[in-house]
């Protein structure tokens, strides 16, 4: 028997990431090749943006995706989020020239407060929310705090792009395929302060740390390369990383919904106090996923170097959180 369609909301649907994302969702890459989807697409109520969204929808129609059971354009989150099972919050105020992340906080706080309230009011009670729009961790925190009737664990932030970037750098360094790397993960904020940790990673049972055996490379090359990759792509391409961000969003939701098959992945989730991260901080953790739920992988020892790195990214997140607290009422 055919499965009932799942409703997927995507905000900023006519943007670069939306364009790289929607066709793949409609093709079944995120929720499974047997899972029909209804796309509920949100753009700002600006005539140009709504017109662009219509154009994207025309293209999606022209793909004749067998799994696409419906598609709607919206300008209001209260209608866009009606009964949604998955919400990808991609749209955010972009960073302009000379703007710091801090400048983005208040502009985005308004957007994500409104979207959190709308999800609280009209989404499925089991909605899975992934925030992609930056600053992703704090935007996810704002949305979560604005949706008191939804379980807090339903709100997540995207660290999977950092995770995937780290995987590809380790693969290049070791000359091994990406698929052979296990137990690599990322702590903290989706920002240059994130801490990609391969101390426990293995390739075919061998320790990656022992294979590389180069703390200077780790500190001076690997971590800055992963942390500043987004800026390097803007520098090279003149546009921000859209296709790789869309790909990471698909990976994140696919694993959350369908399970990671025992593999450790990275998700930004509200802390329960694990690894001494204060309650409710939206933080990248090593997790495994099964049956639509994620679980923090406990028991990794945090050495002095790692604790220092984790504290730096935690401090940044706590500063961001303090910067929006007054906006949350």
UniProtKB/Swiss-Prot annotation:
Keyword Oxidoreductase: yes
Highest taxon above the source species: Bacteria
Keyword match NAD: yes
EC number(s) on file: 1.1.1.37
Cited Gene3D superfamilies: Lactate dehydrogenase/glycoside hydrolase, family 4, C-terminal (3.90.110.10), NAD(P)-binding Rossmann-like Domain (3.40.50.720)
Binding site residues for NAD(+): 12-18, 108, 115, 132-134
Pfam family membership, one: Ldh_1_N
Entry similarity comment: Belongs to the LDH/MDH superfamily. MDH type 2 family.
UniProt GO molecular function: L-malate dehydrogenase (NAD+) activity
Active site positions, chain numbering: 190
Full protein name: Malate dehydrogenase
Gene transcribed to yield this protein: mdh
Origin species: Ralstonia nicotianae (strain ATCC BAA-1114 / GMI1000) (Ralstonia solanacearum)
Keywords from the UniProt entry: NAD, Oxidoreductase, Tricarboxylic acid cycle
Reported function: Catalyzes the reversible oxidation of malate to oxaloacetate.
């Amino acid at each position: 028997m055919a499965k009932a369609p799942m409703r997927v909301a995507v905000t900023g649907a006519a943007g670069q990431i939306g364009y790289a994302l929607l066709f793949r969702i409609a093709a079944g890459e995120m929720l499974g090749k047997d899972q029909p989807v209804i796309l509920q697409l949100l753009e700002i109520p600006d005539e140009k943006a709504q017109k662009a969204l219509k154009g994207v929808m025309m293209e999606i129609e022209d793909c004749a995706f067998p799994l696409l059971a419906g598609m709607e354009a919206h300008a209001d989150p209260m209608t866009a989020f009606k009964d949604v099972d998955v919400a990808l919050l991609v749209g955010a105020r972009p960073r302009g020239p000379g703007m710091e992340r801090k400048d983005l906080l208040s502009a985005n706080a308004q957007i994500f407060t409104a979207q959190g309230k709308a999800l609280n009011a009209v989404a499925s009670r089991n909605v899975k929310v992934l925030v992609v729009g930056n600053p992703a961790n704090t935007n996810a925190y704002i949305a979560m705090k604005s949706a008191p009737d939804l379980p807090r664990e339903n709100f997540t932030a995207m660290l999977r792009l950092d995770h995937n970037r780290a995987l590809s750098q380790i693969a290049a360094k070791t000359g091994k395929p990406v698929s052979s790397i296990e137990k690599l993960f990322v702590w903290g904020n989706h920002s240059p302060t994130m801490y990609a940790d391969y101390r426990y990673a293995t390739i075919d049972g061998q320790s990656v740390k022992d294979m590389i055996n180069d703390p200077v490379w780790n500190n001076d090359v690997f971590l800055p390369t992963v942390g500043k990759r987004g800026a390097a792509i803007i520098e090279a391409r003149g546009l921000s990383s859209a296709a790789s961000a869309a790909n990471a969003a698909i990976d994140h939701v696919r694993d959350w919904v369908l399970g990671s098959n025992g593999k450790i992945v990275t998700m930004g989730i509200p802390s329960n106090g694990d690894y001494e991260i204060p309650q409710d901080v939206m933080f990248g953790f090593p997790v495994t996923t099964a049956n639509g739920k994620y679980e923090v992988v406990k028991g990794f020892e945090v050495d002095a170097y790692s604790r220092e790195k984790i504290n730096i990214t935690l401090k940044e997140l706590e500063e961001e959180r303090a910067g929006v607290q007054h906006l949350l009422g």
